[in-house]
Amino acid sequence: MSASHADQPTQTVSYPQLIDLLRRIFVVHGTSPEVADVLAENCASAQRDGSHSHGIFRIPGYLSSLASGWVDGKAVPVVEDVGAAFVRVDACNGFAQPALAAARSLLIDKARSAGVAILAIRGSHHFAALWPDVEPFAEQGLVALSMVNSMTCVVPHGARQPLFGTNPIAFGAPRAGGEPIVFDLATSAIAHGDVQIAAREGRLLPAGMGVDRDGLPTQEPRAILDGGALLPFGGHKGSALSMMVELLAAGLTGGNFSFEFDWSKHPGAQTPWTGQLLIVIDPDKGAGQHFAQRSEELVRQLHGVGQERLPGDRRYLERARSMAHGIVIAQADLERLQELAGH
């Protein structure tokens, strides 16, 4: 699937139509209807919001991973209530999003009761944008922080070989009078999916994103993908955050570190088999003024000092456009999706 439809014939589909199409694709290619529901909504949401590196661009990777037997598309997550503020989920070698969905209501109940709750997911495959995992909590007035480790492709600061994954972190918080503050970011200098897109489109990357197989700086995306590696953002600072993600998303949850799984016997596998941690906070338990109002005051001050666009603003604008006018997809991509759905 292409990530851009510039200079290509396009078609427009509604958000519900895209969800339905993707759902049928996942079922045809080996997931249960329940898993298909969750994955289709996640993928369609990314496409709707302009997060093209995690929208329909990801479908071939999902399907090749399913076909290889690497991930169980019919896995039923096992939710374990292990403490007043702690929930564990064994994803049973399935996708991470259904594991989160299975535990969400219990996690929210615990957060509202104790003021904070932790969800530790292990044995999971996360192949999607991370912001959809935290946004629903922010919409319910909660603060959420999530992190997931991925496959080895990032050289730690000062090291000679890759060890970490891109290891993204997502944050969501309610805001009075506006959309929730929601963003995610890779702890690598650039997301791995954006490198793949640049390679397909024949574009050079900005300097400082990665190295080739000899450890030399390169702006060629294919050199990074062909035996090279990404760099952490911000040098030692991003490297330290990536290490934190490994410890919390894998070490704490019981999932694999980014370097611990081996998919060599599953040709076509692309989904990292690792872990995920979520921390959910009920801000009403905090002191002072209403948290959402304080969030709005911070936003007002940011605008006052000249920051015109906040993290997530572009995504919300694209969402509004897509919901009003439909999601624009390259005609060739839509036809391919319809073929995959069995049309």
UniProtKB/Swiss-Prot annotation:
It comes from Pseudomonas syringae pv. tomato. Is inhibited by the substrate analog pyrrole-2-carboxylate, and by 2-picolinate. Substrate binds at residues 58, 166, 192-193. The gene is dpkA. Optimum temperature is 30-45 degrees Celsius. Is stable between 0 and 35 degrees Celsius after incubation of 30 minutes. The active site is at residues 53-54, 194. This is Delta(1)-pyrroline-2-carboxylate/Delta(1)-piperideine-2-carboxylate reductase. It catalyses: L-pipecolate + NADP(+) = Delta(1)-piperideine-2-carboxylate + NADPH + H(+); L-proline + NADP(+) = 1-pyrroline-2-carboxylate + NADPH + H(+); N-methyl-L-alanine + NADP(+) + H2O = methylamine + pyruvate + NADPH + H(+). NADP(+) binds at residues 126-130, 184-186, 236-237, 309-315. It is an enzyme of class 1 (oxidoreductase). InterPro entries: Mal/L-sulf/L-lact_DH-like_ah (IPR043144), Mal/L-sulf/L-lact_DH-like_NADP (IPR043143), Mal/L-sulfo/L-lacto_DH-like_sf (IPR036111), Malate/L-lactate_DH-like (IPR003767). Gene3D superfamilies: 1.10.1530.10, Hypothetical oxidoreductase yiak, domain 2. Its EC number is 1.5.1.21, 1.4.1.17. Catalyzes the reduction of both Delta(1)-pyrroline-2-carboxylate (Pyr2C) and Delta(1)-piperideine-2-carboxylate (Pip2C) to L-proline and L-pipecolate, respectively, using NADPH as the electron donor. Can catalyze the reverse oxidation reactions, albeit at a much lower rate. Is also able to catalyze in vitro the NADPH-dependent formation of N-methylalanine from pyruvate and N-methylamine; can act on other alpha-keto acids and specifically uses methylamine and not ammonia for these reductive amination reactions. Can use NADH instead of NADPH, although with much less efficiency. Pfam families: Ldh_2 (PF02615). One of its GO terms (biological process) is methylamine metabolic process. Belongs to the LDH2/MDH2 oxidoreductase family.
